[in-house]
From Swiss-Prot:
Keyword annotations from UniProtKB, A to Z: Fimbrium biogenesis
Name of the protein in its database record: Fimbrial assembly protein, serogroup F1
Length: 48
């Protein structure tokens, strides 16, 4: 495998990783703060 192909694959892999991480963080926020907020706010020490 030549260097140019490796760099291209590394760039695409990095972009895919960042997009996947963004989706995971957004879904975690939706689940823990919108759908099921009660026990997690109390566990983290955020008393409202």
């Amino acid at each position: 495998m030549n260097k140019q192909r490796f760099l291209f694959a590394a760039k695409i892999s990095g972009i895919h990783f960042l997009l996947s991480l963004t989706v995971a963080v957004l879904l975690a926020g939706l689940i823990f703060f919108v759908w099921y907020p009660f026990p997690y706010q109390k566990i983290m020490g955020n008393f409202k």
